[in-house]
């Protein structure tokens, strides 16, 4: 789900779907299906998926950044998702990237209505679009550097609708980040592996961790192997279809 989601599955606040703020989605699903239900923030679940099944399986401290219509973060610290006392850990889009976002957290573009149009114009040689894209990358790198110095992760994973733009986003971002960090070491920056199905895969892991003990009667039962869907069969995220 988009927004702050508490342990019971209630949406505390959602700027993406304001009408859901205060809705007890978890209770509604439990009543509808008559079984235990676990609900969480979608970007946090995507981070869980990349840690268990994706590109970050070998590290336990991960910043997962979803870059699409908005910028959101999921944190894995010590091998576990970091929720925070108010379940707000990672809700940093409007703070760490203030120069990129509107009040609703949506990325604002000047030279075209959508990111796809800005990227296409830049590829076609439009100087204004390329300048805007360069400024976007520098602002993104600065925000990531701030988060990196706060968390000191072993890996940064970029997901969301813009993550597949290697030559226009990921490669320039890899070049810009060391300038903003100024550190004698580099933090690996990788593209998310699970695409639009990352949150769904993370939900499977999350549900197993929450309910396996009730089902099997075994505490701390490890998550069994899960075979991710091939990347080319993953359905697009809402960020990619807008």
Stretches found by the model and what they are:
Residues 1-58, 69, 76:
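Mid-protein regulatory/catalytic core that forms ligand/cofactor-binding pockets
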Residues 41, 67-69, 160-161, 189:
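Short secondary-structure boundary segments
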Residues 13, 63, 190:
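Conserved Rossmann-like nucleotide-binding pocket used by diverse enzymes
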Residues 58-109:
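Glycine-rich phosphate-binding loop of actin/hexokinase-like ATP-binding domains
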Residues 42-44, 86, 194:
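Residues that form or immediately flank small-molecule/cofactor binding pockets and catalytic motifs
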Residues 6-8, 27, 31-35, 52-53, ...:
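ATP-binding/phosphotransfer module of carbohydrate and carboxylate kinases, centering on a glycine-rich
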Residues 19-23, 86-89, 112:
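Short, conserved loop/turn and helix-capping segments at secondary-structure boundaries
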């Amino acid at each position: 789900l988009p927004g702050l989601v508490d342990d019971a599955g209630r949406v505390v606040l959602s700027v993406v779907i304001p009408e859901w703020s205060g809705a007890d989605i978890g209770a509604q699903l439990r009543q509808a299906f008559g079984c235990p239900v676990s609900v969480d923030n979608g970007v946090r679940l995507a981070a869980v998926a990349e840690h268990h099944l994706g590109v970050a399986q070998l590290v336990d401290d991960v910043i997962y950044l979803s870059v699409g219509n908005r910028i959101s973060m999921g944190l894995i610290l010590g091998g576990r998702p970091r929720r925070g006392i108010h379940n707000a850990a990672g809700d940093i889009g409007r703070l760490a990237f203030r120069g990129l976002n509107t009040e609703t957290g949506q990325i604002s573009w000047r030279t075209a209505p959508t990111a796809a149009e800005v990227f296409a114009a830049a590829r076609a040689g439009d100087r204004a679009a390329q300048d805007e894209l360069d400024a976007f990358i520098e602002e993104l790198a600065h925000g990531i550097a701030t988060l990196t110095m706060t968390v000191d992760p072993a890996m940064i994973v970029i997901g969301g609708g813009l993550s597949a733009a290697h030559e226009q986003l990921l490669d320039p971002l890899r070049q810009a980040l060391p300038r903003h960090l100024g550190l004698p070491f580099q933090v690996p920056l990788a593209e998310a592996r699970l695409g639009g199905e990352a949150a769904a895969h993370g939900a499977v892991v999350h549900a197993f961790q929450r309910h396996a003990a009730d089902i099997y009667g075994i505490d701390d039962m490890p998550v069994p192997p899960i075979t991710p869907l091939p990347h080319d069969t993953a359905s697009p995220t809402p960020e990619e279809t807008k």
